[in-house]
Amino acid sequence: MDRFAATVERHWLAWLLAMMLIVTGLPFLSPVLMALGWTNAGTFIYTLYTPFCHQLPQRSWFLFGEKLTYTLDEINRVYPSSDPWQLRFFYGTQAMGWKVAWSDRMLSFYTMTPVFGLLYAALGRGRLRPLPWRLFLLALLPMALDGATHILSDLIFGVSNGGFRDTNVWLALLTGNAFPAFYAGDHFGTFNWYARLFTGLLAAWGVAFFAFPWLDQLQRRRDA
C-alpha cells in the first residue's frame, strides 16, 4: 500500500490527467451508447452530468446524425418545448443523432483542460512557471462574460424569445450586418457557437498553465 501511495505521489500529474480525461471524456460515450440501443446506460451518463452542465440541446453537439448541431426550431419539430429544464432531457433521435452530455462551452472547457495539461507535461514541467494570476483571471474573463450574458438574456427573454444573446443584434450593428447568417442562434457557424468554443479553450489554457505548474511547485517544496 505504501509503495502504491509513493508511486501515485511520484507520478501525481499522470494520475490526475488520466482521471480528468476519463471524467471529461465520458460524456462522449453517451451518444455512442444511445446509438447502440443501450438507452439506460446512455441516460445514466446524461443524468450523472446534469449537475455540471445545462445540456440544452440547441447548444450541444450531436453525433451519428444528420448534423453536428441543430437550431431550437429544428428540435421543437420533434420535441416541442421551450422550458430549459425540459429541453435538457431531449437526448436526440435516430435521425438527428444523439447529443454529447456536455454543452459546447463545457465540452471545450472541461475536455481541453486535461489536454492542455498533457501539453504542459510535454513541454517540460520543471521549466514552466505558473501563469501570473492577472493573466490567469484574464483568460477566464471572456468565458465568464459570455456565460453571464447568456444567463441574463435567458432569464429575461427565455431561451426561445429572441434575447439579446440569441439575436446578437448588438454585434450586427457593430459590424454593419456584414455577415447576416453569423449573428443569430447557437448552431454551428454562428457567433455564439464560436464564442463558446474559443472562450472555453482560452479558459482551459489558463487553468492548465496556472494550476498544474503551481501544483508542481507545491509538490517540489514538499519533496525538498
For the regions a protein language model found, what residue spans apply to each?
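Cytosolic juxtamembrane amphipathic/interface segments immediately preceding
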Residues: 1-9
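Membrane-interface helix-boundary motifs at transmembrane edges
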Residues: 6-7, 122-130
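Membrane-interface loop-to-helix entry segments
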Residues: 99-111, 194-202
